[in-house]
């Protein structure tokens, strides 16, 4: 059944400034055809920048949000790309951090509320397919 979708991507990790984040959403109809394509990006620095501290204008709240028009389901991609390596080379001190992806439909029903563990060294690519398809 057709619905509008809202996607939120966020993390409370204090060194999230070391990463660029891209949220991509493909809105599809019941036939599987793309009817819209949306993207939101939180870009801090070019890959390889190796910043010592966060940029002066860095905002701690880096929630990415996309609201779609009406469609039958969505496919979601989230890219977490490190531009600056962790502050230490100690593997024990650089455990994965949490990134939360939430999706609601226009009835405010939760379709996804998932925590992903992101490797501090490599970042991650998250794929969620056919969100909103009723079984």
Where are these regions (language model features)?
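Short, extreme N-terminal segment that most often corresponds to the first beta-strand
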Residues: 1-24
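Short, solvent-exposed aromatic-acidic interface loops
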Residues: 113-125
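Surface-exposed loop/edge segments in extracytoplasmic proteins
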Residues: 29-39, 107-114
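Exposed aromatic-hydrophobic patches
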Residues: 60-66, 123-133
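Extracellular or exported targeting regions of proteins
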Residues: 82, 113-114, 129
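Short amphipathic, basic-aromatic surface patches that mediate peripheral association
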Residues: 10-14, 80-91
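Short coil-to-beta strand junction motifs in C2/discoidin
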Residues: 18-24, 89-100
